[in-house]
């Protein structure tokens, strides 16, 4: 699935009608310059494994490059977002705990460079994502990725 303009393509690895109750698992594909989400922190831990391509991790206002097979363990409460980098798409395996979770969207100068900062600090997703376009739509991308495979171009 993908959002027309932001967030990349998302491939849930669980059925929509019966999601796992304890964890969320998906593969997210982002293109150069595109964030996977808004800069945020959650009350649970997450893990991110780069399957292919390059991306930039913004964590606690610092930018860090990630390459294929790099892994980032994100402890609960850590502010973060991932932005596509390099010349083509980047696929990331994302795993996170899924109990009722507190999410916070702080204002971030580092993330704002990529359009990945909330306009004002909030803990309301609808408020934080108010300027992001609509729903995720089903899509299939070829694997391995072709650097020209960006469906938005």
Where is each model-derived feature located?
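Short acidic-glycine-tyrosine-enriched beta hairpin
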Residues: 47, 61-77
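Ligand-binding loop in jelly-roll beta-barrel domains
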Residues: 56, 68, 76-102
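A short, N-terminal "cap"/entry segment at the start of jelly-roll beta-barrel domains
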Residues: 1-23, 110-153
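Short, conserved beta-strand element in jelly-roll/cupin
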Residues: 27-32, 40-58, 95-97
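A generic structural signal for short beta-strands and their flanking turns/coil linkers
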Residues: 21-26, 44-46, 53, 76-78, ...
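Conserved short histidine dyad/triad with adjacent acidic residue
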Residues: 9-13, 26-42, 76
């Amino acid at each position: 699935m993908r959002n027309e303009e932001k967030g990349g393509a998302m491939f849930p690895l669980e059925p929509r009608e019966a999601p796992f109750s304890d964890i969320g698992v998906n593969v997210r594909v982002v293109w150069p310059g595109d964030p996977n989400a808004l800069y945020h922190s959650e009350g649970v831990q997450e893990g991110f494994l780069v399957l292919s391509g390059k991306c930039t991790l913004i964590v606690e206002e610092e930018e860090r490059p990630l390459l294929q097979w790099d892994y980032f363990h994100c402890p609960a409460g850590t502010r973060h977002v991932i932005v596509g980098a390099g010349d083509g798409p980047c696929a990331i395996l994302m795993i996170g705990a899924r109990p009722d979770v507190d999410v916070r969207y702080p204002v971030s100068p580092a993330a704002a460079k990529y359009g990945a900062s909330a306009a004002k600090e909030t803990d309301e997703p609808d408020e934080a994502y108010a300027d992001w376009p609509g729903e995720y739509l089903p899509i299939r991308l070829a694997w391995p990725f072709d650097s020209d495979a960006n469906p938005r171009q």
